[in-house]
């Protein structure tokens, strides 16, 4: 299941001076309806233009079809306008915020007297359908002056702010202003040409509302004006729009499946973790079953790190603030840290300070403490590369509005490593680290990757440009040599160095950022890290930051959704459950379970009072990979019958074979769910 693919770029079309782009496209024979209908064109500079655009001179343009990424984006932006028109018809007092297209959809923010209800969304959809059916024309109009724009939009305070801030806005989600002129898009009645509604917007838009063949409003939520919690409270409506009903249905099926796989829902249903209100937002607790999965994840990671030459360290959860002054975190990352704890102050009886206190912080990152371990004694080139590894707990102040289940938390455990090496070792160490990261992710069943290269943010970095350029070039070379697709992320690096991030696609085709590998020449300088080179001189090591899972919590959430809660048998909290056909046969299964437990398998017998079919139903719902059934024939033959998650079954398997099948499957760390077909093929093989 995946999002509909985009069409290939179209051949160029010549638009004569004085002719609309739409006329030239039609005369060139492009479709006038359907999912590949042309909705806008791309000019020679790469900008998107309305089909009503009339160039001053002959120009070649690229037709942009509805079933392309750009085409869908334009459809969604136009759908946002239709939504805003419907809202102001239904709620005349509503004030307009912004309404951009986003991935797979759009939203629009409104200042209204109360939150929107599901009934409101249903009514708004009906209004939108009438507007779409009315085939209103989108007409671009240049406003001659700021004064004229302010007068026309005098009742829209948020639009007035955008007009006043026009020159200082650099936000891709603000579609209202941009370029060298202010424009308003009017929706015109197709019969009379009269203006029905309008909005401040830089465009472009589809020719008419009829070019929105499929849309749906999905939800509403609270929002802040321009994303700042200090600004006005708004209400946001989200929707989706597509080039065809079929494409939208495919997307909605994907959303429904994603909802079924939501790790927050599965975490509760499978008794894996919870978020007690008493602890606070973004602070999960893992229950025994979730603890088993987490322990298995961590133990396998530890084993692989030992094999790769990593050494384990451990650091405290809090530190004096001075450490993060040295590292630069307090200068560049303070907003992401919890407030200081001022402690150790001692007072005299009269209240005067006898001993001043100090600021302590919960650590947001482990790297400064690992630097102290490196610096704790003299280091020789013979020790390098030195690979320090820790499951380190860190704490980051995420705003409550962005905290989301396990994938965005405030307290997390990182599988954090810092590698110290020479300049000569740097490239090979990066390449080895990347291959280790990719291999370990594959071991957990994630094998669809691409890489992202995050480069310097010119407004937020430490060090000099030459060092950054060298680090970036080295990372780019290593990433390109991996053979994976490399996508640029300009300005996305942390303040201390560029990074490669591994982007992983899950079973639904969604992309998650997982591992990061960051090259850093700056922190070794700030911490005065040195090693003795082979010629006896002191040199700075290169530092490589590397988190493979990103965080245990995030990785746990991603795996839960990737497997829809049906974890591979080697990770499953309960790997085998025995289900007797009747209580008479339970002892037979207890003997089998005893053998499995002795072999290290997490096995148990369902001794509840439920009937056999209910037990099968319950344990299937709990995603148990192996269910062993036993009736009279099984007991008589010294056998069991296998039942699997998918409902398939293999009867009469001798107990010795059954124990071997289960232990071999788990021992191989198979990530596929066992089935009758896989078991039979394995036995035959």
UniProtKB/Swiss-Prot annotation:
Zn(2+) binds at residues 367, 418, 545. It comes from the Bacteria. SUPFAM superfamilies: Class II aaRS ABD-related, Class II aaRS and biotin synthetases, ThrRS/AlaRS common domain. Its cofactor is Zn(2+). Pfam families: HGTP_anticodon, tRNA-synt_2b, tRNA_SAD. GO terms for molecular function: ATP binding; metal ion binding; threonine-tRNA ligase activity; tRNA binding. Binds 1 zinc ion per subunit. InterPro entries: aa-tRNA-synt_IIb, aa-tRNA-synth_II, aa-tRNA-synth_II/BPL/LPL, Anticodon-bd, Anticodon-bd_dom_sf, TGS, Thr-tRNA-ligase_IIa, Thr/Ala-tRNA-synth_IIc_edit. Keywords: Aminoacyl-tRNA synthetase, ATP-binding, Cytoplasm, Ligase, Metal-binding, Nucleotide-binding, Protein biosynthesis, RNA-binding, tRNA-binding, Zinc. Its EC number is 6.1.1.3. It is found in: Cytoplasm. CDD domains: ThrRS_anticodon, ThrRS_core. Its main location: cytoplasm. It catalyses: tRNA(Thr) + L-threonine + ATP = L-threonyl-tRNA(Thr) + AMP + diphosphate + H(+). Belongs to the class-II aminoacyl-tRNA synthetase family. Homodimer. Catalyzes the attachment of threonine to tRNA(Thr) in a two-step reaction: L-threonine is first activated by ATP to form Thr-AMP and then transferred to the acceptor end of tRNA(Thr). Also edits incorrectly charged L-seryl-tRNA(Thr). NCBIfam families: thrS (TIGR00418). This is Threonine--tRNA ligase. It comes from Rhodococcus opacus (strain B4). The lineage of its organism: Bacteria, Bacillati, Actinomycetota, Actinomycetes, Mycobacteriales.
């Amino acid at each position: 299941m995946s999002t509909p693919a985009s069409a290939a770029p179209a051949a160029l079309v010549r638009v004569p001076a004085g002719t609309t782009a739409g006329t030239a496209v039609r005369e060139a024979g492009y479709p006038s309806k359907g999912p590949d209908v042309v909705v806008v064109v791309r000019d020679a500079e790469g900008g998107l233009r309305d089909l009503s655009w009339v160039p001053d001179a002959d120009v070649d343009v690229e037709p942009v079809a509805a079933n392309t990424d750009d085409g869908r984006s334009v459809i969604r932006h136009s759908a946002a306008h239709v939504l805003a028109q419907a809202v102001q018809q239904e709620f005349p007092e509503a004030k307009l915020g912004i309404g951009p297209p986003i991935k797979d959809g759009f939203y629009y923010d409104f200042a209204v007297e109360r939150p929107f209800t599901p009934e409101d969304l249903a009514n708004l959809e009906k209004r939108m359908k009438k507007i779409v059916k009315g085939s209103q024309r989108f007409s671009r109009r240049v406003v001659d002056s700021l004064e004229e724009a302010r007068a026309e939009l005098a009742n829209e305070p948020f639009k007035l702010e955008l007009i006043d801030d026009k020159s200082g806005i650099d936000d891709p989600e603000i579609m209202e202003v941009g370029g060298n002129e202010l424009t308003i898009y009017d929706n015109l009645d197709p019969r009379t040409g009269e203006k029905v509604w309008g909005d401040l917007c830089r465009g472009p838009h589809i020719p008419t509302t009829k070019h929105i063949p499929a849309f749906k409003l999905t939800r509403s939520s609270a929002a802040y004006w321009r994303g700042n919690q200090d600004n006005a409270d708004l209400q946001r409506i989200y929707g989706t729009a597509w080039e065809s009903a079929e494409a939208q249905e495919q997307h909605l099926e994907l959303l429904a499946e994603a909802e079924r796989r939501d790790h927050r829902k599965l975490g509760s249903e499978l008794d894996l973790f919870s978020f007690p209100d008493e602890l606070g937002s973004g602070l999960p607790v893992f229950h025994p079953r979730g603890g088993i999965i987490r322990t298995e994840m961590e133990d396998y990671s530890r084993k692989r790190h030992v094999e790769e030459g990593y050494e384990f360290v451990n650091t405290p959860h809090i530190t004096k603030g001075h450490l993060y002054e040295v590292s630069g975190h307090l200068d560049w990352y303070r907003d992401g840290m919890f407030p200081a704890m001022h402690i150790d102050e001692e007072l005299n009886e009269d209240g005067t300070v006898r001993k001043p206190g100090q600021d302590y912080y919960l650590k947001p990152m482990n790297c400064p403490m690992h630097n102290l371990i490196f610096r704790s004694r003299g280091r020789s080139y013979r020790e390098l590369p030195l690979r320090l590894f820790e499951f380190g707990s860190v704490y980051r102040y995420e705003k409550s509005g962005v905290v989301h289940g396990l994938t965005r938390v405030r307290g997390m455990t990182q599988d954090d490593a810092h590698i110290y090496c020479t300049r000569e070792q740097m490239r090979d160490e990066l390449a080895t680290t990347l291959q280790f990261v990719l291999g370990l992710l594959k071991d957990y069943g994630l094998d669809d990757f691409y890489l992202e290269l995050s480069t310097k943010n010119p407004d937020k970095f430490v060090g000099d440009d030459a060092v950054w350029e060298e680090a970036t070039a080295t990372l780019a070379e290593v990433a390109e040599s991996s053979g994976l697709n490399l996508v640029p992320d300009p300005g996305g690096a942390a303040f201390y160095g560029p990074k490669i991030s591994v982007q992983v696609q899950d079973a639904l085709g969604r992309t998650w950022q997982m591992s990061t590998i960051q090259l850093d020449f700056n922190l070794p300088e700030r911490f005065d890290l040195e090693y003795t080179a082979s010629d006896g001189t002191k040199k700075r090591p290169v530092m490589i930051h590397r988190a493979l899972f990103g965080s245990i919590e995030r990785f746990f959430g991603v795996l839960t959704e990737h497997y829809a809660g049906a974890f591979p048998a080697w990770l499953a909290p309960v790997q085998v459950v025995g289900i007797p056909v009747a209580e008479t046969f339970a002892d037979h299964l207890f003997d089998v379970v005893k053998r499995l437990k002795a072999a290290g398998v997490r096995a148990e017998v369902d001794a509840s009072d439920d009937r056999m079919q209910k037990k099968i139903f319950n344990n299937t719902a709990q995603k148990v990979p192996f269910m062993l059934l036993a009736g009279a024939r099984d007991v008589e033959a010294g056998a069991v019958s296998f039942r699997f998650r998918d409902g398939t079954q293999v009867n009469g398997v001798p107990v010795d074979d059954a124990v071997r099948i289960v232990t071999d499957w788990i021992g191989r760390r198979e990530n596929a769910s066992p089935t009758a077909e896989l078991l039979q093929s394995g036995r035959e093989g």
